[in-house]
Regions:
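Active-site beta-strand->loop->alpha-helix modules in alpha/beta enzyme cores, enriched
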Residues: 1-178, 210-213, 268-291
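Hydrophobic alpha-helical segments, principally membrane-spanning helices and signal/leader peptides
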Residues: 34-36, 186, 245
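Short, flexible loop segments at boundaries between secondary-structure elements
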Residues: 171-194, 199
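A conserved mid-domain beta-alpha-beta active-site/ligand-binding segment of alpha/beta enzyme cores
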Residues: 189-249
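C-terminal and late-domain segments of enzyme folds
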Residues: 222, 226-291
């Protein structure tokens, strides 16, 4: 057998073994939240489900660390399983504590029916959901909002996109000077024309997985938290081309997350810049994105 092939075979076997072993790491632990005043921008992650704050939270985490940003996770829904909502909320609280994120709910048990079927067949419920989001946006007036792109496959992810766009436009009708930056995320389906790739340190990737493991009811069923690094590895290769340029060099990092950054003006999303930006582990987030 070819020596080089044997080395690659060992690499694949070791990778698979290490991945399998990672699923045995204890779940559900958390760190207590550190309450301290923030001097940076207000950032809101609008999560379709509990766990999305971890899945797409790399850039918010860097904003917290590098810009002293106040990060709030708006749990738009607690999932569709009524029997799991209390449990998922408890898990979400632990995950947010670990990431030092605030937790906001639009109502006692968040929202239901956040999808385009509801928008078409039950416009009254859709309007009630939009009004609940509008109230929170008016109170918080975040400068930066994260939510899924409009084709992220999952019906609730897509619903959250359109609900947020509608709510932001409604607030801007009353507060024209509020022009937040929106940063669209991807999970279930890659987005068209992303314009931002953010490198993630090993420590931050571990922190995101650690927080994700607090969603015990979900990861016990399917240990997808240990798949997260593989996705982030793939982002480095893919992002070099789709955010950078075809034939572009991959940045010097192990992990990265891909986003699309725009400014909301008069209810319309306008790309924040021409082309794409790649931000390395040691690059300054504030100057790279907001200058």
């Amino acid at each position: 057998m070819n020596t080089a092939f044997e080395q690659y075979l060992n690499f694949v076997k070791n990778f698979a073994q290490l991945h399998k072993k990672a699923a045995e790491i204890p779940l559900g632990e958390s760190n207590p939240k550190i309450d301290s005043p923030k001097t940076g921008p207000k950032v809101m992650i609008c999560s379709p489900h509990p766990d999305d704050e971890c899945v797409v939270g790399a850039l918010p985490l860097r904003m917290q660390q590098e810009m002293d940003a106040e990060i709030s996770n708006l749990a738009v829904t607690l999932g569709s399983n009524e029997d799991r909502k209390k449990g998922r909320l408890a898990e979400l609280e632990k995950a947010c504590e670990t990431l030092n994120f605030n937790l906001l709910l639009p109502g006692e048990s968040a929202l239901d029916g956040v999808n385009l079927t509801t928008k078409k067949s039950n416009p009254e419920l859709w309007s009630e959901n939009a009004a609940a989001i509008v109230d929170i946006l008016k109170t918080e007036l975040p400068e930066i909002l994260f939510f899924p792109h409009d084709n992220d496959y999952n019906s609730t992810h897509i619903g959250v996109h359109f609900l947020m766009m509608e709510a932001i436009a409604n607030v801007q009708n009353e507060k024209a000077d509020w022009q937040p930056t929106i940063i669209e995320t991807e999970f279930w389906h890659m987005m068209e024309k992303p314009n931002l790739m953010v490198a993630v340190s090993d420590e931050d990737e571990a922190r995101l997985i650690y927080a994700l493991s607090a969603h015990t009811g979900e990861v016990e069923r399917n240990p997808y938290h240990v798949n997260h690094p593989a996705r982030m590895l793939d982002n480095v290769t893919r992002g070099a081309e789709v955010v950078g340029s075809q034939g572009g060099e991959a940045p010097e990092c192990n992990f990265a997350m891909i986003y699309r950054c725009s400014k909301m003006k008069n209810g319309i999303a306008v790309p924040a810049w021409d082309g794409g930006k790649i931000i390395g582990v040691n690059d300054d987030i504030k100057s790279a994105i907001f200058s």
